[in-house]
Amino acid sequence: PPLTSCGVQRSESLSAFLEAVPLDVVYSTDYKRTQSTAEPTARAQGLSIQSYSTQALEEMAEQLVRHGQDALVVGHSNTTGVLAGLLVGEEIGSFDESIYNRVYQVVISKNDKRLHVFHTAFDCAGR
């Protein structure tokens, strides 16, 4: 199904949140909702959305590390935490599918891997 009007507002808030972050690539699964969530950020940064499979998270993590790009990866409640964990070498599970305000930032440098979790205020107007 498409994003709700609230989901559209959140996707635009995500784009604004990342406005000052120059991204190299935007990844999303092939689901309509994740594509629609990624679209405002990709458009604002002049990027096309690259697809990835949730069935190959280890490969995705390896690709992200190998390419060393600043990337936005839009995923799902049962895969996003897992992918973040793979990137930093920690076991992180899924989160409740009703949570829409969580942004994981993974910072990988030569000697360190860090995970920051932002609990954003991506609330909907009129709620």
Regions inferred by a protein language model and the residue ranges of each:
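Active-site metal-binding loops of divalent metal-dependent hydrolases
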Residues: S77
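Active-site-proximal alpha-helix that buttresses catalytic centers in soluble enzyme cores
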Residues: P1-G68, T80-L87, E91-R127
